Structure formats: C-alpha cells, structure tokens
Amino acid sequence: MARRPLVMGNWKLNGSKAFTKELITGLKDELNAVSGCDVAIAPPVMYLAEAETALVSSDIALGTQNVDLNKQGAFTGDISTEMLKDFGVKYVIIGHSERRQYHHESDEFIAKKFGVLKDAGLVPVLCIGESEAENEAGKTEEVCARQIDAVMNTLGVEAFNGAVIAYEPIWAIGTGKSATPAQAQAVHAFIRGHIAKQSQAVAERVIIQYGGSVNDANAAELFTQPDIDGALVGGASLKASAFAVIVKAAAKAKN
C-alpha cells in the first residue's frame, strides 16, 4: 500500500509575529506547485493565530508542539484540544525527547495524551527514539518498542490508524549528526514490524517519519528508503528554501 509522505516542521521555541508571517509566505511561494506530499508546520502556540491567517488558501496544515490532557478548568498554563481545534490545528507533536527530558513526561503520560488527541479527532505525531548511551548499548529496538507499547497496551493497535510516528534518535537531534539512511531504515522497519505483530494492516498504513538533523542536504537519500515516510524537521524548517527542498525530495521519492 502506498503511503502519502508527511513532512512537518517543528519550530520549537523560535519565531515572532513577523517571522511567522514571513516564513509562511515564503513556504507558500516555494511549495505552490508541489504535490504528492503532505506538509505541516508546528509554530509556538503563541503564534497559531498568525499562522492560521497566513495559511489561508494553502494546503499546508497547521500543527502544534504540545497539548494538555484536560479540556478546561483550573490548569494554569495549559492548552486543550478544543483550543487547538479552534485555530484549525490538525497535527500535535507529543513525546518529543525535549518534553520527556525537561518536563519529565513518561511513556504512560504520553500515551494518555495520544488518547486525548484521538478522542478529539486530532492527529498525534508520536516521537520515539533512543539516547546515545542506549544506542551504544544496542538498546534502540528495546526503547522504541517500549515507547510504542505504552500506546498499544492501553489504547490498542488500532489507535495508530490515522496517526503518525516520528523516529527521532536523541543523539541526532540538533547535533548535526544523523543516522545513515540504512540505519534509519533498519529502525523504521523494526517499528513497522513491531506494530505488524498486532496488525499487519495498521502497520502498512501508519506514517513513520524520520527526525534528527534532517536537512536539505541529506533528505533525498533518506527518502529513498521504503519505510521512511517523510520527516519531522527542526532547524531546517525555519528557512523556507531549505524546508521546501526537503518537501520536494519527499514528493519526488515517494511518487
């Protein structure tokens, strides 16, 4: 079954009102004639209004970088699924290593977020991946399986229908290091195979992105791999020209 690739930009803690408008204008110009690849951006939640307005008449989808479990009430500083939907958000990144590390989010907590997003009709982008120490100890598959099982064991394998997984080896995030295409493919194939133990149909449909210093120089080679269905892009998503190269590479490789 052919899977439609998804390239998503994670802006992290970057941007301003002016930057948001300028970058989206650039992306619309660069990607105007591109088809065959879904595209999304996840700006800081502060700039969702600017992004929603700037994305009018564009096929670029809006995402965000976090969500709370609660819909409303006395939860200071949090953002609900309903608030995100109010701005036209489609994709929500959860489980990013920076959230796991700095905010001590557990596999179980992330699985709850996954369920909340599914219930709200939003698309979870579940980040998984191992640290450098875990990689060197040969625990990559063990870590990825554990992080996926946290969702499957509580919500069932069918929860991955219409969801996205982003394999992001922690040692490659923002470091300039990247897994080789063959290394990334091996892990992506493992992830798909692990899900296939529960459901071959779900495994064949689920989008598995690669993330970890994806840029305009290495994207094309990564996308030649059969189980890499796009990318979750950090730093390179802050430049319209670089991000467009990545999107075009995915569209070309997968069509």
From Swiss-Prot:
Primary location class: cytoplasm
Top enzyme category: isomerase
Pathway listed: Carbohydrate biosynthesis; gluconeogenesis; Carbohydrate degradation; glycolysis; D-glyceraldehyde 3-phosphate from glycerone phosphate: step 1/1
Keywords, ordered alphabetically: Cytoplasm, Gluconeogenesis, Glycolysis, Isomerase
Reaction equations catalysed: D-glyceraldehyde 3-phosphate = dihydroxyacetone phosphate
GO CC list: cytosol
Domain of life per record: Bacteria
Residues where substrate binds: 10-12, 174, 213, 234-235
E.C. code: 5.3.1.1
Keyword Isomerase assigned: yes
Location in or out of the cell: Cytoplasm
Catalytic residues (positions): 96, 168
GO-annotated biological processes: gluconeogenesis; glyceraldehyde-3-phosphate biosynthetic process; glycerol catabolic process; glycolytic process
GO molecular function, one term: triose-phosphate isomerase activity
Oligomer status and interactors: Homodimer.
Similarity comment: Belongs to the triosephosphate isomerase family.
Its job: Involved in the gluconeogenesis. Catalyzes stereospecifically the conversion of dihydroxyacetone phosphate (DHAP) to D-glyceraldehyde-3-phosphate (G3P).
Name of the molecule in the record: Triosephosphate isomerase
